[in-house]
């Protein structure tokens, strides 16, 4: 009965054009974080994309040392929950704890630490903030049990081509642990990741440049058609 429910959709003429996550992600169970059910998570720090995508949440991590001003900018623009990166690679120790506090104060729904983060730092962060700590897993050799003992609440599996296998191994040992995972580029890879046990899927959107390229190509095609029609007349 529930599968056949009609879902009304409201949009406006100016904002009807947006990026949409793959529909296959809706088959995931989702993770309920602070009362919000999250299935699709867009992987971006681009506020233009964040404001024009139908994902349930954002995972805002980037390959530089985290800066509070960046978190503040994303949080002020986002209209969906944000998981924000607080370091763990280049950034370690007390700074990770301080960045986590700042992220919570700014309204983040969770903080993400990278794989190199020590269990001691994970424990300090968990003891300091009230929002969940998401620990990134990049290999099947990760000591999941020690991460859980340190206080990790969610695992973010990002193991490239091995992601599905890593998710499956974690799920075998821990049936109830929340798992976010990269879904890959195809419908088949997304469904395989969900089948392996992922509760939520991260999706990498096209860049602004890629979206613009398609739009401009369409404009050029229309312009060329009009020009040819004018020449014929």
How does the language model describe each region?
Residues 1-82, 88-93:
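Conserved N-terminal beta1-alpha1 strand-loop-helix module at the mouth
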Residues 108-113, 157-163, 198-216:
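Glycine-rich phosphate-binding active-site loops on the catalytic face of alpha/beta enzymes
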Residues 225-232:
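Conserved small/polar residues in nucleotide/adenosyl-binding loops
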Residues 78-87, 127-136, 173-182:
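Short beta-strand/loop segments at the ligand-binding rim of alpha/beta enzyme cores
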Residues 98, 143-147, 186-198:
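Catalytic cores of alpha/beta
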Residues 51, 72-76, 122-130, 148, ...:
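Surface-exposed amphipathic alpha-helices with a cationic face
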Residues 38, 58-64, 86-88, 108-117, ...:
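Catalytic beta/alpha-barrel core
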Residues 66-105, 116-125, 140-146, 163-167:
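N-terminal active-site wall of soluble small-molecule enzyme domains
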């Amino acid at each position: 009965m529930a599968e056949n429910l009609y879902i009304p959709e409201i949009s406006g003429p100016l904002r009807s054009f947006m990026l949409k996550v793959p529909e296959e992600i809706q088959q995931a169970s989702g993770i309920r974080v602070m009362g919000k059910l999250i299935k699709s998570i867009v992987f971006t720090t681009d506020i233009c994309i964040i404001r024009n995508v139908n994902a349930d949440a954002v995972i805002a991590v980037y390959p530089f040392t985290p800066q509070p001003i960046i978190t503040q900018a994303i949080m002020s623009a986002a209209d969906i929950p944000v998981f924000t990166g607080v370091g763990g690679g280049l950034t370690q120790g007390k700074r990770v704890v301080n960045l986590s506090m700042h992220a919570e104060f700014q309204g983040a729904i969770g903080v993400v630490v990278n794989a190199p983060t020590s269990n001691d730092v994970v424990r300090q962060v968990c003891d300091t903030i009230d929002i969940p700590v998401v620990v990134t897993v990049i290999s099947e050799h990760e000591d999941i049990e020690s991460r859980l003992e340190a206080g990790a609440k969610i695992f973010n599996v990002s193991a490239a081509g091995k992601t599905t296998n890593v998710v499956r191994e974690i799920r075998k040992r821990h049936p109830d642990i929340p798992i976010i995972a990269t879904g890959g580029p195809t419908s088949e890879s997304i469904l395989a990741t969900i089948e392996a046990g992922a509760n939520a899927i991260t999706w990498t959107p096209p860049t602004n440049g890629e979206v613009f390229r398609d739009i401009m190509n369409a404009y050029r095609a229309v312009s060329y058609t009009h020009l040819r029609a004018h020449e014929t007349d």
